[in-house]
UniProtKB/Swiss-Prot annotation:
Its main location: cytoplasm. This is DNA-directed RNA polymerase subunit Rpo7. The lineage of its organism: Archaea, Thermoproteota, Thermoprotei, Sulfolobales, Sulfolobaceae. InterPro entries: NA-bd_OB-fold (IPR012340), RNA_pol_Rpb7-like_N_sf (IPR036898), RNAP_E/RPC8 (IPR004519), RNApol_Rpo7 (IPR046399), Rpb7-like (IPR045113), Rpb7-like_N (IPR005576), S1_domain (IPR003029). GO terms for cellular component: cytoplasm; DNA-directed RNA polymerase complex.
């Protein structure tokens, strides 16, 4: 789920930025500090939308920079359990497929793709169903549900997905299900 999060903090503005807009410099520094990083219990910071820094700062003895209180908005992505996502298969391995969900990739374990037994064809980089002959490969559009997310600071979240429930899976399979149900 994407959301805007308002935060408060202190931003250090080095002397080379003195004389410039405090808000613009604060945004630049906050982007360097937070963008594309994971903040525990908040999510992956995709961008700093705006910032309002106090015009008056304070200094610390021995440091030429000024420190300003700042309030800013971050666009973040937080994976939510049972959230249904659509994405593109970015990688296929013998243990499952990785789905690009935008800011992060999620893993669909081979046991969570379909009820059919899947075999990995390493020459073509494709998973093929033994009975159904359904296949999934890099570039396929899929719909999946988040079943777990492990978020620890400093690295991107590990997200487990499933495609076994009705109307989840490769978009082509879903369209076939809908066509069969409407007959």
């Amino acid at each position: 789920m994407f959301k805007l999060v308002r935060a408060k903090g202190i931003v250090r503005i080095p002397p080379e930025y003195f004389g410039q807009s405090v808000d613009e410099i604060a945004i630049k520094i906050l982007r360097q500090e937070y963008q594309e990083k994971l903040i525990k219990d908040i999510g992956v910071v995709l961008g700093i939308v705006n910032a309002k820094a106090s015009e008056e700062g304070f200094i610390i003895f021995g440091d030429g920079a000024t420190y300003h209180e700042v309030e800013f908005d971050m666009l973040v992505y937080t994976p939510i359990i049972h959230e249904v996502i659509e994405g593109e298969v970015s990688q296929v391995d013998n243990y499952g497929v990785y789905v690009n969900m935008g800011p992060v990739d999620g893993l669909v374990h081979i046991s969570q793709i379909t009820d059919d037994n899947l075999k990995f064809d390493s020459n073509r980089g494709i998973l093929i169903g033994e009975k159904s002959k359904k296949s999934i490969q890099k570039g396929d559009r899929v719909r999946a549900m988040i079943i777990s997310a492990s978020m620890s600071s400093g690295r991107l979240p590990r997200i487990a997905l499933t495609m076994k429930q009705p109307y989840l899976g490769k978009i082509e399979w879903i369209n076939q299900e809908i066509a069969k149900a409407s007959k």
